[in-house]
């Protein structure tokens, strides 16, 4: 009898690979690279090919459409993915060239060393050891520090190319305004540029209006930017819990999330083997990884918040920084005086990190050690270029609690902490709510810009109603689209399992696609240059009944094709000038095309063709007796 291989054994075997679904190219898409000023700046994009259009005047070529690509090497057919070896260190040479870091002889965290020396963990450990780096004594290695010194790093050039999405090629190739025409947007005072330059990237980072999460110990990450004046980004949360999931599950969730468009991934693991899980994820992730270090610190004291200490938390920060975590959520704004403000709430403190620190504050009747040791935290962050994501530990967990005293008291504190972080040249973004009805969302954005000095805003939704468990990806996407339009730089996705359970791969995909819609809708509303090109291309394909192009240009080609084929599965149906909604005789687009073709044949305008058709129908009505209702 064959003994089934356990998930752990399967994951750590020599031929371990990500699941094949995550590395398949999307239909009619190919990975391309745009080279920068040096050979090792190769910016990945996804190019979607289109078929030709047959017109009465002949063949019209439709240009390929380039879109932002977060999938890393996983979608490159020329790359052999082996998760036991991780990804290639893309940024390693750039980091070495700056000559401001040093390779450590060993790990600095006592907990990391303890895990390394435990033989029981050998089977699950990521065994390819990467050298650990730290800033040389007295050096600051943050992208903000370089930016403020006037230095344009390779990361900044990479980002500028990436943000422009090669749209100049569409502008050059398009023979009309059909693809490049765009509605003017309302940006609410943002400084959105027609073209992103490396200098603009540098300036935005220097001013604190954007961050480049890029730990020097995560050289595998492809540079990206989070800021109000750039494309709206989305984050995907993954992570195990005490009730389930494995290392393999979480690595697969990560690769699945980035396939569908996750710009960053947060590992929120609270179950077993958090350290090992995170190592596997980081070594195989081409996108920035964020964490909430207090979660792991709590595990180290067996879940007893009152037993947490600064020393335990400090060691956890160093442990994770040396693994390569790119940004830390730190709930330093949860202060002792704010905790009583939550007593009037319907749902109290719903943030895990916020509740941990509130309990600690009450148990010791002291200010949080995250607040009192904030400058010490800054010293650690700038030695590895870990960005702050200042946590909203007092965010509202219900519509009832939206925009209350506790929430905005914390927001003001986060603004004060931002200035301290900037004094150390540490990149910083601010986390936001939460549960907020639509008419109160704008106030959140306005106050964040005011109190936090235009540091990037990173929000969870917000959810706009509390009545739809199982559909909170939708309730939150409504709020996410709105706050993204108002100026939020990154949206944290919500899956259908929110408030109900641990999301699986399908939930991750649903959350990603839903939030890609919200982010793109926000880009359109802001008038982000080039945001409408993909919409225009898909609309043109739809009008011309180029079904496969319509599927391929969509955010989820698989689902679009599946829905079409449920009623019209034949291959010939993908050439038909109708769908199953209206059928062949009532398709509005088909009727419009017939009018255009008739006008072209008769050498008259479309309006003249419509008037001529109306006159013929009027004559036909009179000829048949002029009766409104005729007997059949």
Curated annotation (Swiss-Prot):
Pathway: Cofactor biosynthesis; thiamine diphosphate biosynthesis. Keywords: 4Fe-4S, Iron, Iron-sulfur, Lyase, Metal-binding, S-adenosyl-L-methionine, Thiamine biosynthesis, Zinc. One of its GO terms (molecular function) is carbon-carbon lyase activity. It is an enzyme of class 4 (lyase). [4Fe-4S] cluster binds at residues 579, 582, 587. It comes from the Bacteria. Its EC number is 4.1.99.17. GO terms for cellular component: cytosol. It catalyses: 5-amino-1-(5-phospho-beta-D-ribosyl)imidazole + S-adenosyl-L-methionine = 4-amino-2-methyl-5-(phosphooxymethyl)pyrimidine + CO + 5'-deoxyadenosine + formate + L-methionine + 3 H(+). The keyword Iron-sulfur applies. Binds 1 [4Fe-4S] cluster per subunit. The cluster is coordinated with 3 cysteines and an exchangeable S-adenosyl-L-methionine. Zn(2+) binds at residues 435, 499. The keyword Membrane does not apply. Belongs to the ThiC family. Catalyzes the synthesis of the hydroxymethylpyrimidine phosphate (HMP-P) moiety of thiamine from aminoimidazole ribotide (AIR) in a radical S-adenosyl-L-methionine (SAM)-dependent reaction. HAMAP family: ThiC. This is Phosphomethylpyrimidine synthase.
């Amino acid at each position: 009898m064959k003994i089934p291989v356990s998930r752990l054994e399967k994951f750590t075997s020599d031929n371990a690979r990500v699941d094949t679904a995550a590395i398949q190219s999307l239909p009619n898409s190919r990975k391309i690279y745009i080279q920068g000023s040096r050979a090792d700046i190769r910016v990945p994009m996804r190019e979607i090919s289109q078929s030709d259009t047959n017109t009465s005047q002949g063949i019209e070529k439709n240009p390929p459409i380039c879109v932002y690509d977060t999938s890393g090497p996983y979608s490159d057919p020329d790359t052999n993915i082996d998760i036991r070896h991780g990804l290639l260190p893309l940024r390693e040479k750039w980091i070495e060239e700056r000559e401001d870091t040093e390779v450590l002889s060993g790990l600095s965290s006592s907990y990391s060393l303890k895990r390394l020396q435990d033989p029981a963990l050998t089977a699950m450990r990521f065994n390819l050891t990467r050298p650990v780096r730290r800033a040389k004594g007295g050096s600051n290695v943050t992208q903000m520090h370089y930016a403020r010194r006037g230095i344009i790093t390779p990361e900044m050039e990479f980002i500028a190319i990436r943000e422009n999405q090669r749209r100049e090629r569409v502008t050059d190739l398009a023979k009309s305004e059909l693809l490049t025409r765009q509605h003017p947007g309302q940006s609410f005072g943002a400084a959105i540029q027609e073209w992103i330059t490396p200098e603009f990237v540098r300036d935005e980072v220097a001013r604190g209006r954007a961050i480049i999460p890029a730990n020097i110990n995560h050289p595998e990450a492809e540079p990206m930017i989070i800021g109000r004046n750039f494309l709206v980004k989305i984050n995907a949360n993954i992570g195990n819990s005490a009730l389930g999931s494995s290392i393999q599950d979480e690595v697969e969730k990560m690769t699945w999330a980035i396939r569908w468009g996750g710009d960053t991934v947060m590992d929120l693991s609270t179950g077993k083997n958090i350290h090992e899980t995170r190592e596997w994820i980081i070594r195989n992730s081409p996108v920035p990884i964020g964490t909430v270090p207090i979660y792991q610190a709590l595990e180290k004291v067996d879940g007893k918040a009152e037993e947490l200490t600064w020393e335990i938390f400090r060691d956890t920060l160093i442990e994770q920084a040396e693994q390569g975590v790119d940004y830390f959520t730190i709930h330093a704004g949860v202060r002792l005086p704010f905790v009583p403000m939550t007593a009037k709430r319907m749902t109290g403190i719903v943030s895990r990190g916020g509740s941990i620190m509130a309990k600690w504050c009450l148990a010791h009747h002291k200010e949080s050690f995250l607040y009192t040791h904030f400058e010490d935290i800054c010293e650690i962050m700038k030695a590895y270029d870990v960005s702050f994501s200042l946590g909203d530990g007092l965010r509202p967990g219900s519509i009832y609690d939206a925009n209350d005293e506790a929430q905005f008291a914390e927001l003001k504190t986060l603004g004060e902490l931002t200035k301290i972080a900037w004094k150390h040249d540490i990149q910083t973004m601010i986390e936001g709510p939460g549960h907020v009805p639509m008419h109160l969302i704008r106030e959140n954005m306005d106050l964040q810009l005011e109190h936090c000095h235009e540091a990037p805003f990173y929000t969870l939704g917000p959810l706009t109603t509390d009545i739809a468990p199982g559909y909170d990806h939708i309730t939150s996407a409504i709020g996410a689209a709105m706050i993204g339009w108002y100026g939020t730089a990154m949206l944290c996705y919500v899956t259908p399992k929110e408030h109900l359970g641990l999301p699986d791969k399908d939930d991750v995909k649903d959350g990603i696609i839903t939030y890609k819609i919200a982010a793109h809708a926000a880009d359109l509303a802001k008038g982000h240059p080039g945001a409408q090109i993909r919409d225009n291309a898909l609309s043109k394909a739809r009008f011309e009944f180029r079904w496969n192009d319509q599927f391929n240009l969509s955010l989820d080609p698989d689902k679009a094709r599946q829905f079409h084929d449920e009623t019209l599965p034949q291959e010939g149906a993908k050439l038909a000038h109708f769908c199953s909604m209206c059928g062949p005789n009532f398709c509005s687009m088909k009727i419009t095309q017939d009018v255009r073709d008739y006008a072209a044949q008769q050498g008259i305008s479309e309006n003249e063709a419509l008037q001529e058709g109306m006159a013929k129908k009027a004559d036909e009505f009179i000829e048949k007796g002029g009766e409104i209702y005729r007997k059949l």
